Each structure stands twice: as C-alpha cells, then as structure tokens.
C-alpha cells in the first residue's frame, strides 16, 4: 500500500510504501509486499522493529531517502557491526538505537515514533537529514553526537517539554539550524560542546530554571545568541576558566 505524508517533515508531501513489520523481520515483510528493499526510496513502517531492522535500513537499503516511523514501536535489540567504521546498533524499548542512521548520506527526511523516549548516541551522525527537526513529546534524553556534523539541518530545532538531558559531547555540533534556541524548562543537564559551532542559532539564550549541570563549551561559537545570561539557582555543576566556559 501507499500513503501520503503531507505534514510530518516541513510540510513536504511524500508518498510512502507502507510496511507492517514485526521486530527483526522488516526485510521479510518488504519481500512479502513484493517490493525490492534495495530500491525503496520512501518507507513507512508500522508494527515493531529492532536493531537488526535498523541495520537493514542503514546498510542494505541503498536508495532510502525518507523514513516514517511515526506509528512504530521500537523493541530492544543489538546488532554488531565492524565494517566501514560504522558503530554497532543497540538500544532498549522505545529508544532510537545507537548509530541507527549514522552516515546514511542519502537520508533526507525522517519522522520519529510517537512513543520514543531516548535518542541514542550517533543516531544520525553525519547523515543527510535536512530541514527542520521536531523532537516529539515524550523524549527525555538525547545522547552523545546524535545530530553531529549535519549542516543540511538548516531549518528549526524544536525540543519537547519532556526533555530532561542532552548528554555526552557534540550532540548538535556543527548543525546548520537557523532559528531561536528554546531550551525546555524541565531540562536538567546539558553536556560538553552540545551546541558547539552552531552560528545559525539567534535570539536571547535563556537557561532553564531547573538546569543542574552544564558542560564545557556547551554554546561555544554560537555567536548570534545574545542577552544577559542568568545562571539558575539549581545549577550545581558549571565549568570554569577561559578554555572551559560554556559560551
């Protein structure tokens, strides 16, 4: 079956092949629909998937440019990878796994699952994802390098009110967003160099009132952020010194 997606990615209409899968069997489900998985460009998945299915999408679906996982549930899994410098794929239930679309240069459009809780490290690292990113409500953590070195992300970044932690280092380093950077009030942790080298962010930088920890260089080289930075009373960890300042 086919389905049109009119609103989920920058209001760009996309026609998807819709595949209902069970975890670990996406490849077989595509074959059962009489489709060649190596030639599919726009894919919408329903049902359940796991790390092995992300391996198929990342490493074997060579034409894939748009993925819609809005109605899918992600199940825990692990797929070991030791080729071409790519990382292994792993995650728990309702987590977008580690490196699941790492260096997937052809991928330009992605719709997140409604039930997503965590975006694991390097999930989209150096992929071709473009335009805006709208992280869905329910996500509580975004990990190390998830959106690192992605200059084609030249739209807006929307973070959910449920977000508690942006952890590790370089999570949005070098992203090309052009928008105001609005941090959710419930955000408690910002890791090192999280927004390093993102000059497209503009407007007043406001740290959340519940922020407890901020890492070195978190906003370094975000030269178009301005305003009088107010340090929240909840902050217990802040780097010091000219080389470690968060901005």
Regions found by a protein language model. Give the residues of each.
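Consensus positions within tandem repeat domains that build extended binding/scaffold surfaces
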Residues: 99-100, 120-123, 143-148, 169-171, ...
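A short acidic, amphipathic alpha-helical/loop segment
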Residues: 52-60
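Structural signature of tandem-repeat unit edges
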Residues: 14-21, 41-49, 64-94, 105-118, ...
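Acidic Gly/Asp/Thr-rich repetitive segments characteristic of extracellular carbohydrate-active
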Residues: 17-39
